[in-house]
Amino acid sequence: MVTIRADEISNIIRERIEQYNREVTIVNTGTVLQVGDGIARIYGLDEVMAGELVEFEEGTIGIALNLESNNVGVVLMGDGLMIQEGSSVKATGKIAQIPVSEAYLGRVINALANPIDGRGKISASESRLIESPAPGIISRRSVYEPLQTGLIAIDSMIPIGRGQRELIIGDRQTGKTAVATDTILNQQGQNVICVYVAIGQKASSVAQVVTSLQERGAMEYTIVVAETADSPATLQYLAPYTGAALAEYFMYREQHTLIIYDDLSKQAQAYRQMSLLLRRPPGREAYPGDVFYLHSRLLERAAKLSSQLGEGSMTALPIVETQSGDVSAYIPTNVISITDGQIFLSADLFNAGIRPAINVGISVSRVGSAAQIKAMKQVAGKLKLELAQFAELEAFAQFSSDLDKATQNQLARGQRLRELLKQSQSAPLTVEEQIMTIYTGTNGYLDGLEIGQVRKFLVQLRTYLKTNKPQFQEIISSTKTLTAEAESFLKEGIQEQLERFLLQEKL
């Protein structure tokens, strides 16, 4: 017969009582009233915060954007096809954040920082809020270091500095993405981390950009954040903030970063779609009233940090698409007023074979020569002036047939200067090569050549100077100034190559 031992039973009961946990977990829940078009209306969720993440029963995550008196408007970060009316939703108590680490370099990710390049998971120990406040006035210092794009027209006349925000604006198919990708290629060896954010583009276009960066070894220092045209509007809206959070991670670690948003018109359209579906009142061009804040809070995160914070920088190149050159539309005017200048690409110039199709007359950099080395300042001033005079004369010359010799010479010089600004895609030039090219043009060495010979001569001149006059490049890179010694090396090289070239052409 089994004996019952009372002491053993009482010990077991005591242990169980000690193990009993009286903690009460409070979950803020709600019920789905309606779902569709990437939007869900939730009843309940009484204590939810604006921008808080909520989780649906079947695993979809959403963001609470509209807090109304009797329901909460949630935008879905997925298709939400499995969400049913009446199913439960719980608030997570978290704001959207992403993991960040050095391991993201060379990878293609989506707006939630998940890899989409098929190369496995990315390890990360830290995380950052997708929307974090921009550095304040005390945390910044003025922009003073150049960020070279490798394009003569930009680096000489519309210079960009580290920590600046420069808008690239133009119609579709005018080479906006090409300017941005060339700038990434030119950062090779410059210790600059690049982030390319593709918003609402064709997957084939993004693949093309990634391939061209891989072929030239630029993916080593680049992160691509891509949300293609078939992505939900919520993710297209979040993608630029994800890119900014990744760039900020490196900026606060005393590194220099460059971020390209391609393009913000698509982000504004995604935000407009979300806002209209949430029944927010539409404003101009049916955009919601806070579309300016959408872009200003993103672009204000670009900064040149003060010496106390390590002097890191984040340079932003937002891209905006115009409709038949209309820069006075809502989104273009908004972004122009937020940024520190704009590079205007013209369809007419592009079709006339002037590529990059930069309209130098209406492009501007509000940082200006503070973002140039001294040697570039020395040669660029003359180029700007001569091109401006040429543009004026060219318009005047259309109405007059008999021009005096001086005017004809000025027109001829202007045409050759315009020729030297032309560059092939994915062929950025070093700052030394740019200086020698501009010097050759502004000092009349190209005047004796036919327009068709200019580019051929310049290519040969760069090679000749590199091999026969390496002292010129050494002086520029060490002193950052066009000294009298450097100028004499340059003059000798140009004269020697010009004689060789003219002999060659005669044969």
From Swiss-Prot:
Binding positions (ATP): 170-177
CDD domains xrefs: ATP-synt_F1_alpha_C, ATP-synt_F1_alpha_N, F1-ATPase_alpha_CD
Entry GO terms, CC: chloroplast thylakoid membrane; proton-transporting ATP synthase complex
Locations listed in the record: Plastid, Chloroplast thylakoid membrane
Protein family (similarity comment): Belongs to the ATPase alpha/beta chains family.
NCBIfam families assigned to the protein according to its UniProt record, in alphabetical order: atpA (TIGR00962), PRK13343.1 (NF009884)
Protein name (database record): ATP synthase subunit alpha, chloroplastic
Organism field: Arabis hirsuta (Hairy rock-cress)
